[in-house]
Swiss-Prot record:
It comes from the Bacteria. Induction: Up-regulated on galacturonic acid. Residues 1-55 form the HTH lacI-type domain. SMART domains: HTH_LACI. Pfam families: LacI, Peripla_BP_1. It comes from Lachnoclostridium phytofermentans (strain ATCC 700394 / DSM 18823 / ISDg) (Clostridium phytofermentans). Involved in control of pectin and galacturonic acid metabolism. Probably represses a comprehensive set of pectin fermentation genes by binding a conserved palindrome at or downstream of their transcription start site to block transcription. In the presence of galacturonic acid may activate transcription of acetate synthesis and other aspects of carbon metabolism. Keywords: Cytoplasm, DNA-binding, Transcription, Transcription regulation. Gene3D superfamilies: 3.40.50.2300, lambda repressor-like DNA-binding domains. Residues 3-22 bind DNA. This is HTH-type transcriptional regulator Cphy_2742. Its main location: cytoplasm.
Length: 333
């Protein structure tokens, strides 16, 4: 039995049940007693939701991150821990890798630690096969699940994400209006976020009536050596491009190195735009124009939503944050 069963049998919202459990005064005595009677009848014992009652709460949040060496994910974990600490919560961090079975294992581990909620950082936690996401939905029946940069429909899963589609659409459109017609797109993932970015690229070309060339959409591992090797093979194939947009800053850094080594000028011959606005953008020459997905804002919003959920408030299940293009030296905007 869980909080949803109590809600259904008592004929009240999940938020109302949560308020009763948390001792929130904004519930009538009649409703409160009805909820308590149902809880007793079905044998439901509050655990992590019972913050106000002090029942089994650990004041601890689980954080799941697929790869702590990824600059975006590492930065997100930092801001999450900072904001949780400000709100009086500790955190357990699990670096899960990308395999489904390890993600399932670590989620089960966090639930066994009786954490108050779980934050999943990055859309790599969403699988293409929807059945493989069932373990996340099952966990959401026990604790609130916060998902950063991905979307999964469930009443107890709360998603905070950037508008990746619009961000890439705007960046590509800006290049096109500057006269760039052969825009190479490099990406390293087919995650929810990765597919949103790719769809933004395609939509921008369509909106400006440019042909969609499959050769100009290349998947590439997120490291310098593989980026260089891929670009070198494209040159040998005779592929021409006058701009490059990448799904990650590191792919753009590899592109900068390759273009410079080939004797072409940036941005005169080739304009380059990265994604994430990471520290890497100012550690290269020329400095990289990049899309800022506001990771700190994402994390602050996520924790703010989480605190409201734990306090029994009604909150939206999806919050979208807009991105900004930070112009530096790899474009001539």
């Amino acid at each position: 039995m869980n909080i949803y069963d109590v809600s259904q049998k008592a004929g009240v919202s999940i938020a109302t049940v949560s308020r009763v459990i948390n001792g929130n005064p904004n519930v009538s005595e009649k409703t409160k007693q009805k909820v308590l009677d149902v809880m007793k009848e079905i044998g439901y014992t509050p655990n992590v939701f019972a913050r106000g009652l002090g029942l089994n709460t650990m004041k601890t949040i689980g954080i799941m991150c697929s790869d702590s060496s990824d600059t975006f994910l590492a930065n997100a974990v930092y801001h999450l821990e900072q904001n949780l600490r400000k709100n009086g919560y500790d955190s357990f961090l699990c670096c899960t890798g990308y395999e489904l079975h390890t993600k399932q294992k670590y989620l089960k581990l966090l639930l066994s630690k009786r954490v108050d909620a779980i934050v999943m950082v990055g859309s790599s936690f969403l699988e293409a096969n929807k059945k493989d996401n069932a373990y996340i939905m099952e966990a959401a029946d026990e604790v609130p699940i916060m998902l950063i940069n991905g979307y999964l429909s469930h009443p107890r899963i709360y998603c905070t994400l950037c508008d990746d589609h619009q961000a890439v659409y705007d960046a590509v459109s800006k290049l096109i209006t500057q006269g760039r017609k052969e825009i190479l797109y490099l990406y390293n993932s087919k995650s929810y976020s990765g597919l949103q970015k790719l769809s933004g690229y395609k939509a921008a070309l369509a909106a400006h009536e440019l042909p969609l060339d499959e050769n100009l959409m290349q998947m590439c591992p997120n490291n310098l050596a593989d980026t260089k090797n891929l670009l070198n093979s494209l040159v040998k194939q005779g592929l021409n491009y006058d701009a490059v947009v990448t799904a990650e800053d590191l792919l753009a850094i590899g592109t900068i190195k390759f273009i410079k080594d080939s004797g072409r000028q940036i941005p005169q011959d080739v304009s380059i735009i990265g994604y994430n606005n990471s520290l890497l953008t100012t550690c290269c020459d020329p400095e990289l124009t990049s899309i800022d997905n506001h990771v700190e804002t994402l994390c602050i919003s996520t924790i703010s939503t989480l605190m409201r959920v734990l306090n029994g408030n009604d909150v939206p299940n999806k919050t979208t944050i807009s991105n900004d293009l930070i112009v530096r030296k790899t474009t001539n905007f």
